[in-house]
Swiss-Prot record:
GO CC annotation terms, alphabetical: cytoplasm
One function term, GO molecular function aspect: tRNA(Ile)-lysidine synthase activity
Keyword Transmembrane: no
Species in which this protein is naturally found: Parasynechococcus marenigrum (strain WH8102)
Catalytic activity: cytidine(34) in tRNA(Ile2) + L-lysine + ATP = lysidine(34) in tRNA(Ile2) + AMP + diphosphate + H(+)
InterPro entries, per the entry: Rossmann-like_a/b/a_fold (IPR014729), TilS/TtcA_N (IPR011063), tRNA_Ile_lys_synt (IPR012094), tRNA_Ile_lys_synt_N (IPR012795), tRNA_Ile_lys_synt_subst-bd (IPR015262)
Entry's localization field: Cytoplasm
SUPFAM superfamilies: Adenine nucleotide alpha hydrolases-like, MesJ substrate recognition domain-like
Matching PANTHER family: TRNA(ILE)-LYSIDINE SYNTHASE-RELATED
Protein name: tRNA(Ile)-lysidine synthase
NCBIfam families associated with the record: lysidine_TilS_N (TIGR02432)
Length: 337
């Protein structure tokens, strides 16, 4: 249970820092845009909440709060009740949803449930979703992506703004205004502004890969190279910007390759492997194929070389890529896949 201390809402250097960032990057949280804050009760999301509540009078966002009770530990219902009471005392509208038993057994399933609930609530409110992800989260994600195997998009993960769901680009957006703050910063925000924090013991569980990165890997790297977490977060941001540039240039390069049935396989195959891979990723994503790992992309890049024979390849989601002669085409999943 969080320590119930009085809330000291006042302008602080933390408010000034975020306010300046929002003026420099107005697309992060557009003024008057309804916002749905995903609040766990931990230090990052509570810092986000208290900063945006005070900045609301300048930026005029309608604010709503959402909390998801995953049921991962015996005290989760108490945290949900305490957080609801805390918000209600401050006239902050909050919705608390409880996950069905067994629906959040893994990190992936929990994330799917959480984001599905957020999407539903955001659509009801006409709001965008805001999370308290920090530069520290970005460094952890970079390490996880490197360990799993990734491409440029994976290295630039945790973008400041993106669609909540990739297959709904015109739907609710996911916004992360605290990527310029570290986890140490959010702890200081909560301390300086006397904001309560509810500690979730599942964040310490070694069963989750991110927790082990946070507790076992990053501390060692920080001892060896102090400040490395922030440098990794900065690298992720630069990579994200580089990818945006690459995407725009690749769109221009893709136009001459398009045919009535797909792509000109010979013109694609004559390109350098790295260019061929990038254009293939963009074209497939436009068709709805996104879950491609680095190993499969390398395999396809080699098999689509000009000197390679015709062939086919099954892709995630039931898609099938086929190529023969000049033609490269994509077959959609069978009905009911």
């Amino acid at each position: 249970m969080g320590e119930q201390r009085p809330l000291a809402l006042a302008w602080s250097p933390w408010h000034d820092r975020l306010h300046r960032r929002l003026h420099q990057h107005p697309q992060l949280l557009p003024q008057r845009q309804p916002l749905l804050l995903a609040v766990s009760g931990g230090q990052d999301s509570m810092a986000l909440l208290v900063l945006l509540q005070e900045l609301q009078r300048l930026h005029h966002w309608p604010l709503n709060i959402w909390h998801g009770d995953h049921g991962w530990h015996s005290g989760s219902a108490v945290i949900a009740a305490d957080l609801r009471s805390w918000c209600q005392q401050r006239d902050l509208p909050i919705q608390v949803d409880q996950a069905p038993q067994g629906s959040t057994a893994s990190e992936a399933s929990a994330r799917h449930w959480r984001y599905s609930q957020l999407q539903q609530r955001a659509e009801e409110l006409g709001a965008d979703v805001v999370t308290g992800h920090t530069a520290s989260d970005r460094a952890e994600t970079l390490l996880l992506q490197l360990a799993r195997g990734t491409d440029l998009a994976g290295l630039g993960a945790l973008r400041p703004v993106r669609p909540l769901f990739n297959d709904s680009p015109d739907g609710a957006q996911l916004r992360r205004p605290l990527l310029g703050f570290s986890r140490a910063d959010t702890a200081a925000v909560c301390r300086d502004l006397q904001v309560p924090i509810w500690h979730d013991p599942s964040n310490q569980s070694p069963a989750f890969a991110r927790n082990r990165i946070r507790a076992e890997v990053l501390p060692v790297l920080e001892q060896l190279h102090p400040g490395c977490s922030q440098r990794m977060a900065n690298l992720a941001e630069r990579t994200s910007q580089l990818r945006d540039t690459q995407q725009e240039l690749s769109q221009l390069a893709l136009q001459p390759l398009r045919t009535s049935t797909g792509l000109d396989r010979r013109r694609l195959g004559a390109l350098q492997p790295s260019t061929r891979r990038q254009l293939l990723v963009i074209w497939l994503a436009q068709q709805g194929v996104t879950a491609l790992n680095a190993a499969l992309l390398e395999q396809l890049t080699d098999r689509l070389a000009l000197s390679a024979a015709g062939g086919s390849c099954d892709l995630p989601g039931g898609w099938r890529l086929q190529w023969q002669g000049d033609n490269l085409s994509l077959q959609p999943p069978a009905a009911g896949h």
